[in-house]
Design a protein with these regions (language model features):
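Structural signature of PLP-dependent enzymes
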Residues: 152-156, 175-197
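Active-site phosphate-binding strand-loop segment of PLP-dependent enzymes
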Residues: 36-106
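A short helix-loop-beta submotif of the ANL/AMP-binding
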Residues: 21, 25-31
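Active-site PLP attachment segment
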Residues: 114-151, 163
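Conserved glycine-rich beta-strand-loop-beta hairpin in the small C-terminal domain of fold type I
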Residues: 172, 188-197, 208-219
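Phosphate-binding glycine-rich loop
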Residues: 1-8
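A short helix->loop->beta-strand "cap" motif at the edges of active sites that frequently abuts
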Residues: 7, 28, 84-91, 119-120
Length: 219
C-alpha cells in the first residue's frame, strides 16, 4: 500500500523471518542492519543514521522482539526518534504484538508514545495471537495515519476480505473482558524462560542473554 519499486525498508536483525520477504513481495528493498548481542540485539541510533537514504520509506521496529525477546527502553526509542526527526520522509512500522508479555518489571513503550512528533508517521500493528493466546483465530489490527489505513483497507479488501465474524466477536470480548489472566499467563512464561536460560547458559558452548519480553530465547 505504501512501497514503490526500489523503496527501502530498514529491518534490524535478528528479525521475524517474514519481514524481508514482505518487502520484496511489494517490490521494495530490505536494508538489514545487524544488531549484535553487545547492543542487546537492538538498533543503535548511529547505525540507523548511516543506513537512511533518500529511498528509505520505512523503519520496522519489533519490541519485545521475535526472536530475541529484547525490549527497547523509553530512552532508546527517544534516541532513535531524534534520528528520525531529521528524516521526515521515513515512516515507522511498530510491531507491538508482544506488548503485554514482559518480565522483571520492564515497562513496554512504543515509539509514537515517547516521540509525539512521530505520531503521524507511525503505523502500529498488533493482534490477539500472543497476549490473548488466540493464534488460530487470525485477528490483527492496525492504527496509523488515515491515508495509510485507507490504502491498507483497499489492499486488504481485495486480498482476504475479512476474518471470520466469530473471531471478531471473540476478540472484542478478549479486549474488553477481564485482563487478570495475562499476569498469570506471564508467570508461566517467566518460569519457562528462567529454566531455558539457566539450562542453556550451563551448557558448554552455548550462551544466551535474559530476554525482557515475548516468549523466545536467542542463543
Amino acid at each position: 500500500a505504501t512501497i514503490n519499486s526500489g523503496d527501502e525498508v530498514i529491518i534490524p536483525a535478528p528479525y521475524w523471518v517474514s519481514y524481508p520477504d514482505i518487502v520484496v513481495l511489494n517490490d521494495g528493498k530490505p536494508v538489514v542492519i545487524e544488531c549484535g548481542e553487545s547492543s542487546g540485539f537492538k538498533l543503535l541510533p548511529e547505525d540507523l543514521e548511516k543506513n537512511i537514504s533518500s529511498k528509505t520509506k520505512w523503519l520496522m521496529l519489533n519490541s519485545p522482539s521475535n526472536p530475541t525477546g529484547s525490549m527497547y527502553t523509553k530512552e532508546e526509542l527517544m534516541a532513535l526518534g531524534e534520528v528520525l526527526k531529521k528524516h521526515e520522509h521515513v515512516y515507522v512500522l511498530s510491531d507491538d504484538i508482544y506488548e503485554k508479555i514482559v518480565y522483571d518489571g520492564n515497562i513496554f513503550h512504543t515509539i509514537a508514545e515517547v516521540c509525539p512528533f512521530l505520531f503521524d508517521r507511525t503505523l502500529t500493528m498488533n493482534g490477539l495471537s500472543k497476549s490473548y493466546c488466540m493464534t488460530g483465530w487470525r485477528v490483527g489490527y492496525a492504527a496509523g495515519p488515515t491515508n495509510i489505513i485507507n490504502a491498507m483497507n483497499k489492499v486488504q479488501s481485495q486480498n482476504v476480505s475479512s476474518t471470520a465474524s466469530i473471531s471478531m466477536a471473540a476478540s472484542v470480548e478478549a479486549l474488553n473482558g477481564d485482563q487478570s489472566f495475562i499476569a498469570s499467563n506471564n508467570e508461566s512464561f517467566l518460569r519457562r524462560r528462567d529454566l531455558v536460560v539457566k539450562n542453556l547458559n550451563e551448557t558448554p558452548g552455548l550462551s544466551c542473554r535474559v530476554p525482557e519480553g515475548a516468549f523466545y530465547v536467542f542463543a
